Amino acid sequence: MTKVVNNLQDIFLNGARKNRIPVTIYLTNGFQLKGFVKGFDNFTVILDSDGKQMMIYKHAISTINPAKPLLFVQNPNGDDYKDKE
């Protein structure tokens, strides 16, 4: 059974992950992390940066900025989202 993505946070992170779009993650303490989203759950994001993986707690994230816009449309079967471009 396929999990239906139903909130903007999951749609955004899943789009960045599936389309391998580089992101810059700004933390609440001012640090910037650049890399690719490899996975996420309700509390964390896994970021691949220069071949190293980091687990970042979502409560420490201020902003996530993708290298290119993520525009989403729902597939006709209703179980996935993909980049519109």
UniProtKB/Swiss-Prot annotation:
PROSITE patterns associated with the record: SM (PS52002)
One of the record's GO cellular component terms: cytosol
Record InterPro entries: Hfq, LSM_dom_sf, Sm
Gene Ontology terms for molecular function: RNA binding
Coiled-coil region: none
Keyword RNA-binding: yes
Presence of the UniProt keyword RNA-binding in the record: yes
Pfam families named among the record's database cross-references: Hfq
Occurrences of domain Sm (ranges): 10-70
Gene3D superfamilies: 2.30.30.100
Keywords: RNA-binding, Stress response
GO BP, sorted A to Z: regulation of DNA-templated transcription; regulation of RNA stability; regulation of translation, ncRNA-mediated
Summary of subunit composition and partner proteins: Homohexamer.
Function: RNA chaperone that binds small regulatory RNA (sRNAs) and mRNAs to facilitate mRNA translational regulation in response to envelope stress, environmental stress and changes in metabolite concentrations. Also binds with high specificity to tRNAs.
Family: Belongs to the Hfq family.
Identification of the protein by name: RNA-binding protein Hfq
Lineage of source species: Bacteria, Bacillati, Bacillota, Clostridia, Eubacteriales
